[in-house]
Amino acid sequence: MRVTAPRTLLLLLSGGLALTETWAGSHSLRYFDTAVSRPGRREPRFISVGYVDDTQFVRFDSDAASPRGEPRAPWVEQEGPEYWDRETQKYKRQAQADRVSLRNLRGYYNQSEDGSHTLQWMYGCDLGPDGRLLRGYGQSAYDGKDYIALNEDLRSWTAADTAAQITQRKWEAAREAEQLRAYLEGKRVESCRRYLENGKETLQRTECPKTHMTHHPVSDHEATLRCWALAFYPAEITLTWQRDGEDQIQDTELVETRPAGDGTFQKWAAVVVPSGQEQRYTCHVQHEGLPEPLTLRWKPTSQPTIPIVGIVAGLAVLAVLAVLGAVVTAMMCRRKSSGGKGGSCSQAACSNSAQGSDESLIACKA
């Protein structure tokens, strides 16, 4: 492996440098790279995206009309032409390293040139509130299966199979882990620090979750209660179901936190309960933007007893009130800060319903 381009996703960052200021909570810098071989075409397609705290800030696509590193967040647009030139060259070197790796891997697995194959890398680091390294990580996959990963000590590798052991022996002989560790403890942490400072108005803000609960009959005897948390930032959140005060971890269906498409995140957790026993279950929501955890309990709606005309008129009034309420809630819940931990939003406001450019990375080849 050569110390040049940021190579495919196994590089992770790390570092032990202190920041000159303190940030709320931990922060992360992650890159996701994908190289896909295409039979009949000379070069595989290479795509790389970078995230700071789960917010995409950069992208590169080798199939673009003019392949270059492209900004995906306003705060990174302030970087000058030299930065983007270095980024573009970095991605091109990385793409070339992945092309070589794809060819090598095809040989390791005794595969023909007829099929399409995929090499993926994920690498990154987490920094603490003081800007020091909490952990570094990196892992790769070939055709959707684990291949090789850097261990937590940042000094050794774990191979998933005998083919990956070939790569492991190559990298151990070349002392790649040592080079990688030294690189990560320097430039990667510096880059993360700079991104957090430049994007602090966005990256260090807090938006508390909008929550509600839904009820879905499964049969005559059971129903699903689903606890929703929407429009929150940062992405870290905890949803917990309890029955009579006891956690229902084994019986909870929990989806991964996912982007909402507007810079915020959403998540839900569900539990199947016996019909008529819904009141025994509560959902507990914890998030940095909340002054204290929220507790939600299902409240069944009463049957309508007013005339249909009254219903229509009432809905019209409620629609107006809902718009006004949403504006007020948004004003109360949205907080942009440059450091303080914890939100300024109240439980009532937040609950909708109680129901550094890298001059080089390590372009290692498998």
From Swiss-Prot:
Keyword Plastid recorded: no
Domain Ig-like C1-type: 209-297
Annotated signal sequence range: 1-24
PROSITE patterns membership: IG_LIKE, IG_MHC
Region span, Alpha-1: 25-114
Family assignment from sequence similarity: Belongs to the MHC class I family.
PANTHER family in the record: HLA CLASS I HISTOCOMPATIBILITY ANTIGEN, C ALPHA CHAIN, MHC CLASS I-RELATED
Name by which UniProt lists this protein: Patr class I histocompatibility antigen, C alpha chain
Originating organism: Pan troglodytes
